[in-house]
């Protein structure tokens, strides 16, 4: 029978509920338990697929093709368990489900209300499909007091009564700010946050208190007294140097012990944290460092590239080097020479993106990397721009472009109109909806034997996650290969180009998929490990 941990947040947003949930999941997993993590998002979008990357951050894609919140990336990286579309739900999805049911007559003429219909939909989502797990950790998005989060709070309150006694625990993540003028940490914001949570009928079992310095014992006792939790259940969550320190830090503070005690599991099996200690040791004691330029379109919000950033650091862990990131807005290269920006870097990465803005700058970055023999990693849009660069400057395809940018006589990159997913033919048109209409999720690819990328994978058969509407036009394949660009990977039916490379370049690889989504600190993705290895070699030349 599954036990449930509900994680809420108070005082301010962006406290790190996702990291806290993921770290707790990793700790329980290290004790041998089977763990599932789920995210409940209060926004009215059906999913984040059409939301601006500079507002919402990264859209994390699962194997089964769901466009989800970036916190699911944290869940996967910390636990190694691949999430599914049933691990994330939004208010928009819930209301859509309810309205669809109402239109079908499923409610038999009843007046559809927030209670019980919305709350029941939320509860059904939380508890279904959990028979194979020991613990289900549910993160509630937003902050206590938000209007949008009210149905979720009511639903998890009801679940505290619906579930068998002793199978639900509430963890409240809060902030204890330091006031320089007073020279002390303040408990009042946490007190008020807990008071508001209690007014909703939820009594936290554990307080996880964020702070930038040690919380004095007297202040912990004060929180225990005023927030009605055991002194041992006031857990300090101090700032750490990197997020992979969090599981060990929380274990030292006793979070996992306290959660298990709240469930009455004593004595609990000891956690095996050796792999996490090795990761943290490699991060703390690098044997070198490299600088990677990320030439992107959404550099104003680094969360737009969250999995990418982490995957690069995973590559650093694999090579025992520190990875420094140089962020460059791609539009800069449309006005300025890229050389002064890129001459000193050890690798260039052009990530995914949408739309014409900044595309020429990415093409210039690809040309610089090709001509100067700097390691280049093009992901999704970054691969497409590298192919357009080759078409223009190597294959003499004047006007080579993408139909994403408008009509063109040389559509080197074009809209995918149809492809096969499973046994079903998927069809799209330029006039179709944007939401949920891309080539999404895991697809297989066949790599050409003897290519650099097949050597990196150690296989010619791979499966990676995709999120794109446009694809390199296979009609240009022969012309490009005659100029030295190798199409090293194709879809199994040979229709869709998946990877490209230059055999005479130290490391120039483009992939249509998103390998960053499958990288883990305990299991770095081979492409990122190889890219950072190549950058390390480049650092000895610069």
From Swiss-Prot:
Transmembrane segments: none annotated. It comes from Rhizobium johnstonii (strain DSM 114642 / LMG 32736 / 3841) (Rhizobium leguminosarum bv. viciae). One of its GO terms (cellular component) is cytosol. It is an enzyme of class 6 (ligase). PROSITE patterns: GATASE_TYPE_1. The keyword Ligase applies. ATP binds at residues 14-19, 71. The active site is at 380 (nucleophile), 514, 516. This is CTP synthase. Pathway: Pyrimidine metabolism; CTP biosynthesis via de novo pathway; CTP from UDP: step 2/2. Belongs to the CTP synthase family. Keywords: ATP-binding, Glutamine amidotransferase, Ligase, Magnesium, Metal-binding, Nucleotide-binding, Pyrimidine biosynthesis. CTP binds at residues 13, 146-148, 186-191, 222. Residues 291-541 form the Glutamine amidotransferase type-1 domain. Allosterically activated by GTP, when glutamine is the substrate; GTP has no effect on the reaction when ammonia is the substrate. The allosteric effector GTP functions by stabilizing the protein conformation that binds the tetrahedral intermediate(s) formed during glutamine hydrolysis. Inhibited by the product CTP, via allosteric rather than competitive inhibition. It catalyses: UTP + L-glutamine + ATP + H2O = CTP + L-glutamate + ADP + phosphate + 2 H(+); L-glutamine + H2O = L-glutamate + NH4(+); UTP + NH4(+) + ATP = CTP + ADP + phosphate + 2 H(+). Its EC number is 6.3.4.2. GO terms for biological process: 'de novo' CTP biosynthetic process; pyrimidine nucleobase biosynthetic process. Residues 1-265 are annotated as: Amidoligase domain. The keyword DNA-binding does not apply. The gene is pyrG. CTPSs have evolved a hybrid strategy for distinguishing between UTP and CTP. The overlapping regions of the product feedback inhibitory and substrate sites recognize a common feature in both compounds, the triphosphate moiety. To differentiate isosteric substrate and product pyrimidine rings, an additional pocket far from the expected kinase/ligase catalytic site, specifically recognizes the cytosine and ribose portions of the product inhibitor. Homotetramer.
């Amino acid at each position: 029978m599954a036990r449930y941990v509900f994680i809420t947040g108070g005082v301010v947003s962006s406290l790190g509920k996702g990291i806290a949930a993921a770290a707790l999941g990793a700790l329980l997993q290290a004790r041998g338990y089977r763990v599932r993590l789920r995210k409940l998002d209060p926004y009215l979008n059906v999913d984040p697929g059409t939301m601006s990357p500079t507002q919402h951050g990264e859209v994390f894609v699962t194997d089964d093709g769901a466009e989800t919140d970036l916190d699911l990336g944290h869940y996967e990286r910390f636990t190694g368990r691949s999430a599914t579309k049933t691990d994330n739900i939004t208010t928009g999805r819930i209301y859509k489900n309810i309205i669809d049911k109402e239109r079908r007559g499923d409610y038999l003429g009843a007046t559809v209300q927030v209670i019980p219909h919305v709350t029941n939909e939320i509860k059904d989502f939380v508890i279904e499909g959990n028979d194979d797990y020991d613990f289900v950790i549910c993160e509630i998005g937003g902050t206590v007091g938000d209007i949008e989060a009210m149905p979720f709070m009511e639903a998890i309150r009801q679940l505290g009564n619906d579930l068998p006694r002793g199978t639900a625990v509430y963890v409240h993540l809060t902030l204890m700010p330091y006031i320089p003028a007073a020279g002390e940490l303040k408990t009042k914001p946490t007190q008020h946050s807990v008071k508001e949570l209690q007014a909703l009928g939820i009594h936290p079992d554990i307080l996880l208190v964020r702070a930038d310095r040690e919380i004095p014992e007297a202040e912990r006792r004060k929180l225990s007294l005023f927030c009605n939790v055991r002194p041992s259940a006031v857990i300090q969550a101090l700032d750490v140097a990197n997020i992979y320190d969090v599981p060990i830090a929380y274990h030292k503070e006793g979070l996992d012990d306290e959660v298990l005690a709240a469930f009455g599991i004593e004595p609990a099996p000891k956690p095996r944290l050796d792999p996490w200690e090795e990761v943290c040791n490699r991060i703390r004691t690098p044997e070198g460092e490299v600088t990677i330029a990320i030439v992107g379109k959404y550099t104003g919000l680094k969360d737009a590239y969250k999995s990418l950033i982490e995957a690069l650091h995973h590559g650093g862990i694999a090579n025992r080097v520190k990875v420094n990131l140089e962020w460059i807005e791609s539009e800069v290269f449309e006005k300025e020479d890229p050389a002064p920006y890129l001459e000193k870097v050890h690798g260039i990465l052009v990530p995914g993106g949408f739309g014409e803005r900044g595309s020429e700058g990415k093409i210039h970055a690809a040309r610089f990397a090709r001509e100067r023999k700097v390691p280049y990693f093009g992901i999704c849009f970054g691969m497409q721009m590298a192919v357009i660069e080759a078409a223009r400057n190597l294959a003499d395809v004047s006007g080579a472009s993408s139909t994403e940018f408008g009509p063109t006589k040389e559509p080197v990159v074009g809209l995918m109109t149809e492809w096969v997913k499973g046994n079903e033919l998927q069809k799209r048109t330029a006039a179709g909806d944007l939401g949920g209409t891309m080539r999404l999720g895991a697809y297989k690819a066949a790599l050409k034997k003897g290519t650099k990328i097949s050597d990196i994978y150690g296989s010619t058969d791979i499966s990676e996650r995709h999120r794109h509407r446009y694809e390199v036009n296979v009609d240009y394949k022969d012309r490009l290969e005659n100029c030295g660009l190798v199409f090293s990977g194709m879809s199994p039916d040979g229709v869709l180009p998946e990877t490209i490379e230059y055999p005479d370049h130290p490391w120039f690889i483009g992939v249509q998929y998103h390998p960053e989504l499958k990288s883990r600190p305990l299991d770095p993705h081979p492409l990122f490990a190889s890219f950072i290895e190549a950058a390390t070699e480049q650092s000895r030349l610069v």
